[in-house]
Amino acid sequence: MATIEQAAPRDASLRHKRVINDMSIQVATVNGSGSQTANSVLLRAIFQMGIPVSGKNIFPSNIAGLPTWYTIRANHNGYIARKKEIDFLVAMNAETAREDVMNLQAAAGVVYDEPLNLKSLRSDLTFYPVPFDKLVAPVCPDARLRRLVRNMIYVGVLAHLLDVDLAEAEKALNKQLGSKPKALALNWNAIRAGVDYAQQNFQKFERFGVARMNKTAGKILIDGNSAAAIGCMFAGVTVLAWYPITPSSSLAEAVIDYMHQYRVDPQTGKATYAIVQAEDELAALGIAIGAGWAGARAMTNTSGPGISLMAEFTGLAYYVEVPVVIIDVQRTGPSTGLPTRTMQGDILSTVYLSHGDTMHILLLPSSVEECYTMSMEAFDLAEEFQTPVFLMSDLDLGMNNWMADPLEYPDKPIARGKVLSAADLERIGKFERYRDVDGDGIPYRTLPGTEHPLAPYFTRGSGHNEKAGYSEKPEDYKNNMDRLRRKYETARTRVPAPVVESDPNAEIGIIAFGSSHWAILEARDQLRQEQNIPTAYLRIRALPFNDDLRDFVKRMKRVYVVEQNRDGQMCELVRLAVWRDCNKVRSVRHYTGFPIDARTITDEILTQELSG
């Protein structure tokens, strides 16, 4: 067992040394008050200074009036997972201000709306009262707009206190509002008012600040839903059937915008796509399956409640072998749960979705780049294996902005799998829709409209034989189910392999997937630097697993599966896959609805190590 030491106390002489480019800022406002634009400007300004950043929006499941928090993390080491400790608070919401202040760690800074009178709450914080209403009045004559514009004042105040480059703030604002000259001028004047007030009344914040670096050159800021939508377009999607649901709606909206731009016949001006907002998620999947059967590249997107409704049609697509892509941007459950909080809670329900024996292909992106590349790959896999393929994102990855390298133009053609043309049918002289010709479990198919007498077949969700004829014979049913299992085994060699980061000295292994990846990177450094515990790491990128997983677990003394759900769903799947070594596998679970953080992972692993 690894030796665990108590972390040494920080040198008191360093307690007031200004920390540069390593801080977390939380803005507490009211939903619908216009703070999103101000927060985006602040995030982008720091990003444009060359400092690695991430933004996390914790918002309520209503349109306006309830508390919302936006956290910006800047870190010179490139750590972009959520950090629990807040170093600077902007308190704009009277309902939560006192609790927000009491939750801060010592020596934090607080900018607050002056009437809230927070200064007396704690003596170990630095307070900066700002008269927002007084400052916004001369900047914005229209009283109806003041509640929106006033948020830009705290951008200016923070620019002074933390040394955010004002020129970069101006560029960021221009990127946000450049197409609206009046709004641009109005908001810039509000930022200037905040800067001027802060310069006249406050010293720089002595504990934290930012300074220009060169670690974001060439990178972009983008959310996972937008990246996935771009991937779907490059994959050739022409049919989107969907039903609105948080947090996946923005993905569909992005696909629709791109279709309007790029799926129009240049000669006629007519649309070459179909978008259907269905009456519910079940209907949406039914439409997508019909389109996939007809030969279109079709998709739907949803979240956990929609996945529950889609079970019956998913089983149909699996059994009759129709390609379709389903993007699940996961949120908390069960039932309505917390619609605007994140979780990785749909893994077990999705991999086995439907009644009877079904096992589905799941792709598990951990970055916006993989949201892009895996959404493309999902369509290829769906057609190659003639089956539903699920892309499993989550709210944190899908709706928050992340740093990323520019998305690369695809370098390989679309792969449609085993599709027979009329010429193929004429040459082979025989076609049996569900026959395993090649031994890989994947049959050949034809598309409606193929002009050959052998091409048509009847697609049925009831029992069928190799010729697609109705059959209740036990041998036909068993033969079909065995072939479907062979097809799934073949998929092990085709889905994205896990990424393994080895350490020759490691006895402890960590397994994770999806957006948890970023907290894992930081937690591994914490374990090594604070406790001298080296770790190896395997990041699962798809189901079904390949042999890399078994080999990884076999090499380790103990393996911790880290995930964001209560029941350790991925851990159970890992234990099934490595049943000979399942006693090595332990579970680290996080399920508050907030994105997972490194310290939670580190502390839980250390606790389990101490307990044996």
Language model features with spans:
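Active-site cofactor/cluster-binding pocket
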Residues: 2-235, 239-241
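Flexible, glycine/charged-enriched surface loops at secondary-structure junctions
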Residues: 10, 56, 168-169, 181-189, ...
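Metallocofactor- and cofactor-centric catalytic cores in central/energy metabolism, strongly enriched
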Residues: 14, 71-75, 88, 92-93, ...
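Thiamine diphosphate
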Residues: 19-101, 239, 246-352, 361-382, ...
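A glycine-rich phosphate-binding loop feature that marks nucleotide/adenosyl-phosphate handling sites
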Residues: 59, 211-214, 247-250, 279, ...
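Short gly/pro/ser/thr-enriched loop/turn and capping motifs at secondary-structure boundaries
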Residues: 60-63, 117-120, 135, 248-249, ...
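A short helix->loop->beta-strand "cap" motif at the edges of active sites that frequently abuts
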Residues: 104-110, 124-125, 273, 322, ...
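Flexible, low-complexity linker and terminal segments
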Residues: 221-235, 374, 379-612
